[in-house]
Amino acid sequence: MRIIKYLTILVISVVILTSCQSSSSQESTKSGEFRIVPTTVALTMTLDKLDLPIVGKPTSYKTLPNRYKDVPEIGQPMEPNVEAVKKLKPTHVLSVSTIKDEMQPFYKQLNMKGYFYDFDSLKGMQKSITQLGDQFNRKAQAKELNDHLNSVKQKIENKAAKQKKHPKVLILMGVPGSYLVATDKSYIGDLVKIAGGENVIKVKDRQYISSNTENLLNINPDIILRLPHGMSEEVKKMFQKEFKQNDIWKHFKAVKNNHVYDLEEVPFGITANVDADKAMTQLYDLFYKDKK
């Protein structure tokens, strides 16, 4: 009987101890003791808006939130340093779905689950903001951010809908030495549509395509947008040289009417980001500045 009583007490003690440990673990998670490492700038900026601490940040020439100034860098978004990340003992390492295939070997070396979020469009980013809010106990902050973005988007769409004519827009995305043409599937293409512009490129299955200037002239857009991706000053000079030396550009309606605009990486960029409110507003003002 004594043995049975002893074993009963022992089992109860183990159950209570396990329950306490489980409860403690849950409370720890609820209190936000996550060790988060975002691998892209867009994710880093989003986590800042959600008032979340991080233990690692991507290496970037872009200005990151001041609250993260002392956070260790972990390398470029496409090539994070595995050992640098491991040292941080993260619970979550975050990336974006656009580069999911490229990031799989990285997560395999980390021996961790990969968390991927859609930042290809405003709608995709807003869904990701909700997911992050649910995942890291920031539902109120996520709702507030999405409500603000929805409010600005609705305001811009309503104003654009009242315009009698919508400009035809060509979007060039430049990197040092070359450029591509952006479609509606790209983030910048999505913003142009929201702001009331009509993308002259009708490709539906790719974000960016190559195209020669002769074909583009046949489309003859009202407005040309030039967006740099990395080394923005060098890309601006490249575009200026291209438009000056390639004689065909002078025949474009947009060039003749001085409707060629160089966009800044902030608030634009090639992936969705929390500065989308400013980007939508700037595009609308460019498209309809003569109709205010």
From Swiss-Prot:
The keyword GTP-binding does not apply. A lipid is attached at residue 20 (S-diacylglycerol cysteine). Heme binds at residues 41-42, 60-61, 78, 229. It comes from the Bacteria. Residues 1-19 form the signal peptide. Binds 1 heme b (iron(II)-protoporphyrin IX) group per subunit. The gene is isdE. Keywords: Cell membrane, Heme, Iron, Lipoprotein, Membrane, Metal-binding, Palmitate, Signal, Transport. Belongs to the bacterial solute-binding protein 8 family. Residues 35-291 form the Fe/B12 periplasmic-binding domain. GO terms for molecular function: heme binding; metal ion binding. Pfam families: Peripla_BP_2. Its cofactor is heme b. Induction: Repressed by fur in the presence of iron. GO terms for biological process: cellular response to iron ion; heme transport. A lipid is attached at residue 20 (N-palmitoyl cysteine). The lineage of its organism: Bacteria, Bacillati, Bacillota, Bacilli, Bacillales. Gene3D superfamilies: Nitrogenase molybdenum iron protein domain. It comes from Staphylococcus aureus (strain MRSA252). It is a lipid-anchor. InterPro entries: ABC_Transporter_SBP, ABC_transptr_haem-bd_IsdE, ABC_transptr_periplasmic_BD. Involved in heme (porphyrin) scavenging. Binds Fe(2+) and Fe(3+) heme but the largest fraction is Fe(2+) heme. Functions as a high-affinity heme binding protein and probably has a role in relaying heme-iron from cell wall-anchored isd proteins receptors to the probable permease IsdF. GO terms for cellular component: plasma membrane. This is High-affinity heme uptake system protein IsdE. NCBIfam families: IsdE (TIGR03659). It is found in: Cell membrane.
